[in-house]
């Protein structure tokens, strides 16, 4: 059966309009993918939906998923774990203060962890300190080893950014030798921060779960931002600094009602000062 000339031109026009709309949608997608190369579809949709409305474009999350799939732009999650914790040492381990405890404001609980990153020069170690309530990365240090002095520098950076704090401030980490060291513990005492650590004994299989937030932030940074292979450690350090800025400013979190870490902090800052 044939179709009328009018029906043909109408179909042609619809296809053309769809192609133009798709082009605009992909343009918005690439704006954010340039900042956050591996951000997933759900968060991407949240970021662009306001701009879609401004342009009069109708596109739901399922439609965005379809468009990304057609253009080979879906992100496949990566899972890789490398142990960086050495808990078999003689130094004092502190109890877990976060059992049945959740932060209710910014600068109340900081979580710390060490992860490995690579450049063409070899393997390096990245120490991070994150605010458990806002998900802000507050401090970091890139180094060639896991010595305590490097981890302490990440803590110093984090505490420099604390202008208003909870009455009781907790620092939570695994039981690694760096965090148990006298150097690190004396730094916590200097800042008046209570140490908290993952459990040992029968609970040792649950280390990862007990410091899950810190390890989750490691994963986000490595899997969504640090995907370009840098030639030197210095170049990698610049990339990390830039990535942390973008993460804090632009990356929404489901756990924060799709707000960014910085937005969450700004929302709570008035309460902290009051």
Set out the residue ranges of the language-model regions.
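Mobile genetic element proteins and their domesticated derivatives, centered on retroelements
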Residues: 1, 8, 29, 44, ...
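C-terminal domain-tail junction helix/linker
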Residues: 189-191, 219-274
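An active-site-proximal beta-strand-loop segment
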Residues: 99, 103-138, 144
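Active-site beta-loop-alpha junctions of metal-dependent nucleic acid enzymes
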Residues: 122, 141-164, 180
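Basic, flexible linker segments flanking DNA-binding modules
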Residues: 5-105, 202-208, 261-270
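K/E-rich alpha-helical interaction surfaces of small helical-bundle regulatory domains
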Residues: 1-15, 37, 239-257
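RNase H-like two-metal-ion nuclease catalytic core shared by retroviral integrases
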Residues: 85-87, 173-175, 181-185, 197-222, ...
